[in-house]
Structure formats: C-alpha cells, structure tokens
Amino acid sequence: MPLARHLAGELGITWTDLWNVGRGELEPESKASGNQHAGILPPVENVHQPGDGWVDCACGRKHWGTNGASGILLARRDPVSGKVTHVVMQHRAAWSAEGGTWGIPGGATADGESPIEGALRESYEEANITPEDIEVVGSYREDHGPWAYTTVFAFEKPGHTVEPKANDDESMEICWVPIDDVPNRKLLTAMKTDWPRFAARLDELACAGHR
C-alpha cells in the first residue's frame, strides 16, 4: 500500500483532496467545470487502493472514499505552559478541488482500516508524520450516513520533533503553522467551518494533558 501511495504521488494523483468536493468536481467528465483551477489538470493516469472510489452522499454531494476518509490534525505544545503553539497544515495542490487552500493531511480509509489507522498511514505517506513521534488524543467524526470524515487530534510527543514535508504532488507545502495564523490562511471550506471548534478542542486536550 505505501508503494502504491508513493507511485501515485509520483504521478501527481490525489485522493486526500477529493473527500469533500461537490458533485462532479474533478470527475473525468467535468474537471473543467468543477475546478476553479480548470487550466491545471491532474494526470489522466490513476493508481487506486482498496477503499478508493466515489460515494453518493445523502447531503447531495459526492465524497471520496468508499469506507470514508480521515486526516490528522497534529498540534505542537509549548513545553513550559503546555499551550498549543502550532499545527501541521497542508497547502493543497493548485489543480486539486479547492486548490490553493489549506487543510490537514489525510485521505480515503483503506479496506480493513479504522479511521485512525487510515489517518496515521496517510499522514506518514503524504506528510512525513511518523506515528512514533505523535500521540493520538481524540477524534471528531462528521457522519453523513453513507460516508463520514474523521478528524484525528494528535500532539507531538515531548522530546520528539516532527518535520513535516510534502511527499507527493497533492501538496504545494506541508508545514507547521502558528495557531494564531490559521484563521488568516485561505482555508478549505470544511476546515474554515470547523476550525473554531477544533481550536477549542485542542486547547481542552492540551490543558487536560498538562495537569
């Protein structure tokens, strides 16, 4: 599976940026009409893994991931105060759905994986986030019925250093972003909606872990 993911990256294929796109966006027959960067198209070739595929959602949209999808919201804490100082964010490829916006690393959940396992795998393959360097502390599941997206909350472990980087063409950049700067970024629509809730939850989890 990591090999397939690597090959997909070399081809510039994406699946993490497809989980929240509207009906027809980036589908072969409607790339030009569904993508604001219509002149920047992904390669025709594609590499699939079990779990890749479109789901017709009850919300009236199509989402990527037959088993749902998930991503890691990784935070760094001040070693003295315990407060959250940074989070890892993904600057999405220009040709992708909502290209040029910022979100979190993640993607479709493979057959046999839990959402957390899928998020850990995707974040390692896509963003160089090694599971050994982080601590999973919670999750939030947005459930649409036939499809769901799970945001996994995690902290960089004390004494460990995560050095995120873009491992494939799905991202222009993956980096640590100061927590106060997140709202100033051009966020993915779903992230813009959820960010106030996510930021508050990270603060709660950080305080609980620092007691």
Language model regions located:
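N-terminal leader/linker segments that precede catalytic domains of diphosphate-processing enzymes
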Residues: 1-12, 24-101, 107-160, 206-211
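NUDIX/MutT-family hydrolases
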Residues: 163-201
